[in-house]
A protein has these predicted regions:
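Acidic/His- and Gly-rich active-site-bordering loop/insert found
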Residues: 1-100, 109-125
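Hydrophobic face of alpha-helices
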Residues: 14, 32-39, 111, 208, ...
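Divalent metal-coordination and catalytic microenvironments
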Residues: 21, 61, 74, 104, ...
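A structural signal for isolated positions on well-ordered beta-strands in alpha/beta enzyme cores
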Residues: 50, 130-132, 289
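Histidine/acidic-residue-rich, glycine-tolerant segments that coordinate divalent metal ions
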Residues: 59, 81-83, 87-99, 105-106, ...
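Hydrophobic beta-strand positions in extracellular immunoglobulin-like domains
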Residues: 63, 191-193, 258
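Non-cysteine beta-strand/loop elements that form the S-adenosyl-L-methionine
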Residues: 73-75, 187, 345-350
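Metal-dependent amide/peptide-bond hydrolase catalytic core
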Residues: 212-392
Length: 392
């Protein structure tokens, strides 16, 4: 039996689970009921289940093959976002202010589908397949924390995962080698001026004016400090300052992010930002401090793993389903796994205007064409089987 023969059989199964999870979202590090539901379903398949009882969120399932061998992990993230859903379909979120707006509901459903297929084909598995249902991806720290649970990560030899992607037409899959998603870091800028009366600005140092100048000058970091051949995104997402209409605020705080693909350039990017922040503030008689927090490194696919994934997609779904897609600037904590183990991270197309699947990730109208998810389940299952067979 081959997974391609099970795609139609499990199509509704995978769709139903995606819609169940969509209706019952839980935020990062709060995925308690999600974890219980996953554990119960996996146990019903005869999968060995290890729940992170210390945290109460996240679990590892293990499928032992008919023959001994190495171990590979298939990963799905399980957390939702603090977004108020504006969709109106019958499986929209039942929880105010919480929504699966990034597609992790689809990831869980895909991996459950893969588990169904793998348990039906144990005779083809030459080793162990670990099913990693990881919490808190949206925090950036979910993977590093989860890797420590039960030493599971030390027991595997390779890993595979993916992300449903709204920019890719439904049914297509991209598994190219090299950088696929950007490194993500958080920046906080603290501005200190001098508070004063709104009618006497000459006796104050206006933190709002200083912060505004910093935002404008930071645009030159990308346009004048970085090669046009490199990719850098620098975004300021919030500014907080003042509380009264007639008071010049003496302090301001800004938060933002930078995204890039070249780790060797990170120090240069940070120092360029720091120089602009500090010297712009000095020009206005103020001071400013940059706080830099690394979140995730770039997600970089191993060449051999990607080559195998391409063969698996073609063999399982047909050559017409293998797509090429440019790397993207959002970050993904799957990158932490790829820092230590060979693996591949796939993009799974879910865009379909006929079902309203056109809104971007993190949008309150986000949805997907979930009719294609069982095909992704087949790719996950066949990748695990193929990798174990080629690495006896």
């Amino acid at each position: 039996m081959h997974s391609r023969d099970l795609i139609e059989q499990y199509k509704t199964y995978v769709q139903d689970w995606r819609r169940y999870f969509h209706k019952h979202p839980e935020l990062s590090n709060e995925e308690f009921e999600t974890t219980k539901t996953l554990a119960k379903e996996l146990e019903s398949m005869g999968v060995e289940v290890h729940v992170d009882t210390e945290r109460g969120t996240g679990l590892i399932g293990i499928i032992h093959g008919a023959k001994p061998g190495k171990a590979i992990a298939l990963r799905a993230d399980i957390d939702a976002l603090p977004v108020q859903e504006h969709n109106t379909f019958d499986f929209k979120s039942d929880v105010d202010g919480k929504m699966h707006a990034c597609g992790h509901d689809g990831h869980m459903a895909i991996l459950l589908g893969a588990a169904k297929m793998l348990t039906a084909m144990k005779d083809r598995i030459e080793g162990d397949v670990y099913l990693a249902f990881q919490p808190a991806e949206e925090t950036g720290a979910g993977a590093p924390d989860f890797m420590k649970f039960d030493n599971w990560f030390e027991k595997i030899d390779a890993i595979f995962g993916g992300h449903v992607w709204i920019d890719l037409p439904a049914g297509l899959i991209s598994v190219e080698e090299g950088p696929r998603m950007a490194a993500s870091s958080k920046i906080i800028i603290l501005v200190k001026g001098k508070q004063g009366h709104g009618a006497q600005p000459h006796q104050a140092i206006d933190a709002v004016v200083v912060a505004s100048a910093i935002v404008m000058n930071l645009q030159t970091v990308v346009s004048r400090n970085v090669s046009a051949l490199d990719s850098l995104v620098l975004t300021i997402g919030n500014i907080h300052s003042g509380s009264e209409w007639n008071v010049i605020p003496g302090e301001a705080q800004m938060g933002g992010t930078i995204r890039f693909f070249e780790p060797a350039q990170e120090d240069h990017y940070v120092e360029s930002i720091r120089r602009v922040v500090e010297h712009t503030a000095l020009a206005y008689g103020a001071t400013a401090e940059l706080i830099y927090e690394k979140k995730v490194p770039p997600t970089i696919n191993d060449a051999a793993a990607s080559e195998l994934a391409e063969r698996v997609v073609i063999d399982t779904l047909g050559k017409e389903k293998l797509s090429k897609m440019r790397k993207v600037m959002p970050g993904e904590d799957f990158a932490w796994y790829l820092q230590e183990k060979p693996g591949c991270f796939a993009f799974i197309g879910i865009q379909n205007p006929e079902v309203g699947a056109t809104f971007d990730h993190h949008n309150n109208r986000f949805t997907m064409d979930d009719s294609v998810l069982s095909a992704a389940s087949a790719v996950y299952a066949e990748y695990a089987i193929a990798w174990l067979k080629e690495h006896k």
